[in-house]
Amino acid sequence: ILGETKRWLDIYFRGAEPDFMPPLHPIGSDFQQVVWKILRQIPYGTTRTYGDIAAQIARARGVAKMSAQAVGGAVGHNDISILIPCHRVVGKSGSLTGYAAGLEKKIRLLTLEKVDMSRFFVPKKGTAL
């Protein structure tokens, strides 16, 4: 597993999309597992909002609404950053929020993936998702 993960990271940090995923077995609540599975489905070089993910979960569960803040909490408890790409999740209106390794690293990862950064901004402290 470690060899596969190293190979995946080597490919990723060369600025290419790896064509495989090493096996991952993150430990978390059922809700966190659902969110992390969705994160792994966000295509390389794209982003989703916390609200997008909340709406996807709500549809799958047959409920009217799901909290974007609850999604943010699950994203924040992801211990396998990059492989479970929480850096691809952004706030509504393009705000770059909530990356445990810091917003500078989030910006670098999105830039590495050639995401168009012109539509994003770093919010002032205290701004919600």
Summary of predicted features, one role per range:
Residues 64-108, 117:
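Short glycine/serine-rich loop segments
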Residues 1-62, 66, 112-129:
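Basic nucleic-acid-binding alpha-helical/helix-turn surface characteristic of O6-alkylguanine DNA
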